[in-house]
Design a protein with these regions (language model features):
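S-adenosyl-L-methionine-dependent methyltransferase catalytic module, highlighting the catalytic core
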Residues: 57-65, 69-71, 75, 79-141
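Conserved SAM-binding loop
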Residues: 2-86
Length: 141
């Protein structure tokens, strides 16, 4: 199963299209800051988050719960595709609905192997993957 989370007006064939607003007439209406998500554990093979993550999870606990839910619903070896604006680009800075910059390093905090490597060398990076039992691996920049 493939899901297009925060789809807005970009409804995709072959995906379950989910958005917070009924206005978009998507398959599922659900707020991504409300938990749990309406999917069974280990049921999703692909997640698309296109220009979504920067709009949700302003509070650290909420953002971590979003990551926990993504991890819960994904099968082993699932693919999560994330598109976000660069945090220093005018597109990010000028939109008042952008509440959190999303960076490669920030997402890497949820990679257990990197967490362990950082701990061995005394890096100051917070090992969120180890703390919250989330293990995402970055495969493409």
């Amino acid at each position: 199963m493939k899901v297009n989370l925060g789809c807005g007006n970009k409804l995709l064939k072959g995906y379950i299209n989910l958005d917070k607003f009924e206005y978009y007439n998507c398959d599922v209406t659900h707020d991504l800051e409300k938990f749990p998500y309406p999917f069974k554990s280990n049921s999703i093979q692909e997640v698309l988050l296109s220009h979504v993550l920067e709009h949700i999870g302003q509070q650290p606990d909420t953002f971590i719960n979003i990551m926990k839910e993504l991890y819960r619903i994904c099968k082993n070896q699932s693919l999560i595709i994330i598109n976000v604006p660069h945090p220093r680009h005018e597109d990010f800075l000028s939109d008042p609905t952008h509440v959190r910059p999303i960076t490669i390093l920030g997402l890497s905090l949820f990679d257990k192997k990197l967490n362990e490597e950082w701990q061995k060398v005394g890096a100051a990076n917070t090992p969120l993957g180890l703390i919250h039992n989330i293990n995402f691996k970055r495969i493409i920049d």
